[in-house]
Amino acid sequence: MHIPESLQDLADSEAVQFLKRPKAITRIFAGVFSLIVFSSLLTDGYQNKTDNSELHCVLNSNSTACSIAVGAGLLAFLSSLAFLALDAHEVRLASTRFKTAFQLLDLILAVIWAGVWAVGFCFLANQWHRSPPRYFLLGSNSAKAAITFSFFSILVWIFQAYLAFQELRNDAPVPYKRSLDEGGVVLTSLSPPSAASPVNTPTTGPHGPSYASSSLSPYLSTPKAPRLAMMPDN
């Protein structure tokens, strides 16, 4: 294992360059926001009321709201970690079809998670708005943190979908590109010259190639037979 000897070597290392990519930064933010959502409700999201010791969800005593937020946050956190690990090995993918399928899956999941967090944010905000004030002793800060970072998760996953779409569009292979280029060259060379295209006409002077070929053509095309010479008698 190579240990960097200076800060410049550390900054130029492959791991640091990978973490500086916009896609990697976006996945890290998405994972951190998801971690805050499910951890805040998992720890302080269930509190007892002032009149009894039974635990209830701080979001309008609706256990479904807390369960959805915890489940969505946990799955989004694991999804961000999984795709971050796959991004690290993306350069080693030899198959172009597999790489395209991976980018398409990344785009689809980013759009799905953006929609999930949009619905979740609206649902959590609605349940918190319906919660009676000072109904629980603790847990209000956890509920506000979950709602806030649910909204931030919408923006992060939308940007992640945008990055995935740009990468898919830029890296999409064009089938038969070389064949089409070669066919275009052949058709261009066989097509008749247009009025706009320059036509190179050979010169007809004594030093031109057409003059030389015309002057040599009779000797090259019709060879003469040998003649018999008559010698006079002495």
Swiss-Prot record:
Q: Which residues form the MARVEL domain?
A: 18-169
Annotated membrane topology is: Multi-pass membrane protein
Q: What keywords is this UniProt entry annotated with?
A: Membrane, Transmembrane, Transmembrane helix
This protein's major location comes to membrane
List localization entries.
Membrane
This protein's record includes keyword DNA-binding: no
Can the keyword rRNA processing be found in this entry's annotation? Answer: no
The residues forming a coiled coil are none
Q: Which GO terms describe its cellular component?
A: neuromuscular junction; synaptic vesicle membrane
| Low complexity bias: start-end ranges | 209-221
Region (Disordered) residue spans: 191-226
Residues annotated as transmembrane: 25-45, 66-86, 104-124, 145-165
The protein's matches in InterPro entries, at most eight in alphabetical order, are given as: Marvel, Synaptogyrin
* Similarity comment: family membership: Belongs to the synaptogyrin family.
Name this polypeptide is given: Synaptogyrin-4
Instruction: Tell me the classification of the organism that encodes this protein.
Output: Eukaryota, Metazoa, Chordata, Craniata, Vertebrata
